């Protein structure tokens, strides 16, 4: 059976993704760090979700990236786009927790997400398994990854979009710690990929978060 049957629209949408026999550099980077790489390639969409936190310390902008990489019949695919890995300025200064705003710590989080509804409203990836966050509590308009205050657990760290109809340029209130895609159309394509992946490989998605300097 052709696993692409029934997802012609997705094939059209993925024309811009990079296809190459060579391993993507983000996959090489996470492999070097000792993280698991999913590369069983008899069926498509065995996803490696790699988020890259920018070296640029500027806050409230979508200056990070996410790569959805999978290998199919010996050929790698790399669909990538801008995101934010970090909370917006509003939530940095108005944390939901008295311990501070949640910033996802770099690492690999097995089965972190499943498909579901973000805040009960629209299809997204929602937290299923524990994640480790660093608490930024000093309200200094900067992302503080060295506070020393860490927590592991369920904090509603989802992957969702910003504005539903147009691209978002400032993070603002869109993220209180979630990984957020600023572009609604690209997010729709993402969700098509996750739907297909969950049918084939199960409804469980691992996040690997690294620094730009790891590349």
Question: Language-model segments: what does each one mean?
Answer:
Residues 2-172, 186-195, 201-205, 212-214:
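Cell wall/extracellular polymer interaction/catalysis modules
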Residues 182-183:
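Helix-capping/helix-break motifs at membrane-protein junctions
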């Amino acid at each position: 059976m052709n696993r692409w049957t029934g997802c012609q629209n997705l094939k059209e949408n993925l024309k811009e993704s990079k296809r190459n026999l060579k391993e993507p550099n983000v996959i090489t980077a996470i492999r070097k760090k000792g993280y698991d790489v999913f590369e069983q390639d008899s069926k498509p969409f065995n996803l490696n979700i790699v988020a890259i936190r920018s070296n640029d310390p500027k806050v409230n902008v979508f200056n990070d990236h996410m790569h959805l990489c999978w290998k199919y019949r010996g050929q790698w695919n790399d669909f990538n786009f801008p995101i934010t890995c970090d909370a917006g300025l509003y939530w940095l200064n108005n944390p939901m927790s008295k311990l501070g705003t949640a910033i996802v710590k770099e690492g690999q989080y097995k089965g972190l997400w499943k498909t579901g509804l973000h805040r009960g409203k629209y299809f997204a990836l929602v937290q299923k398994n524990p994640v480790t966050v660093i608490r930024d509590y000093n309200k200094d308009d900067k992302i503080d990854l060295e506070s020393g205050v860490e927590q592991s657990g369920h904090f509603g760290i989802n992957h969702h979009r910003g504005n539903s109809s147009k691209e978002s340029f400032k993070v603002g209130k869109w993220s209180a710690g979630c990984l957020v895609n600023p572009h609604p159309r690209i997010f729709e394509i993402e969700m098509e990929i996750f739907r297909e992946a969950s049918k084939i490989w199960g409804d469980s998605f691992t996040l690997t978060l690294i620094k730009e300097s790891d590349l």
